[in-house]
Amino acid sequence: ESLVHGDFRLGNIIVNADGLQSIIDWELAHIGNPLQDLGWVCGNSWRFGQNDKVVGGFGELEDLLEGYNSISKLKVNKEMVKCWQVFGTFRWGVICLIQAYAHLNGTINSIEKAAIGRRVSETEIDIVDLLFLGGE
């Protein structure tokens, strides 16, 4: 187990010409399996149309695995990341449902929450693709 960010994706990474500057939004951090962050950043929801770039819409899975394996004692392969990608996609779907429910029951009056709630169907398709159609 290790420290897991919990929402590791491009929107929470600050870079400039000098490279990585910061990783922000640690409110979902917890102790857990570090592969959760790898699966999360590979989720289709964070690719924003760049579906050929499995890692956050900007990188190749092979490069991520090579880099990770070069510095980690834990050796990771595609199948391990895919398991956590399925978990992360399911988790995002549940988060979408919670956001929609908060809007619908009046807890949070927010068009943003309602719009996020509509993304549940995307996670359903992504899980079917990952489990049955050979998706990455």
Short names for language-model regions:
Residues 105, 110-136:
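Regulatory N- and C-terminal appendages and interdomain linkers associated
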Residues 23, 33, 87, 120-122:
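Residue-level recognition of hydrophobic positions within alpha-helical transmembrane segments
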Residues 29-32, 58, 110, 114-117:
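Short, conserved loop/turn and helix-capping segments at secondary-structure boundaries
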Residues 51-52, 78-80, 106-112:
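Short, surface-exposed loop/turn segments at secondary-structure junctions
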Residues 1-36, 42:
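Active-site acidic catalytic loop and adjacent metal/ATP-binding pocket
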Residues 35-73, 87-105:
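Active-site activation/catalytic loop segments of kinase-like enzymes and analogous catalytic loops
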Residues 23, 59-77, 122-123, 127, ...:
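Short amphipathic alpha-helical segments and their helix-coil junctions
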